[in-house]
Amino acid sequence: MADITEVQYIWKNGEMVPWAEATTHVLSHSLHYGSGVFEGIRCYKDPDSDKSFVFRLQDHMERLHRSAKIASIELPYTVEELCAATVEVIRANKLPSCYIRPIVYRGYGVMGVDPSGAPTDVVIACWPWDAYLGPDALAN
């Protein structure tokens, strides 16, 4: 487990918003009924150049789309748009390497088991995160 290091921006519903403004209401449908999907992705800096690479970004976003479909959540962005938004938020935060968390969930507006009418919120956050299992993970 690692603490989250705040960065400047989060991509939310097609816009780059300041970290502190990327909030979700406590009565959002997903918070009460678990109606959401997410991915966990890594971006790595190439040690031999000044370039960074997102690991299997297209595959992750395709899986996010499939997961949303299985959960009956209509995702309002294409795979290509989500990939572009991911690169955009990494660049906006000037992160050479990071953890990326895209999440799709039903937002605030309706309550009850039937999610009809609940808006779909899409967020892509990223932040610095070293080795997932800690600095000694590879050695041990």
Report residues per predicted region:
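Conserved alpha/beta cores of soluble small-molecule-handling proteins
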Residues: 1-140
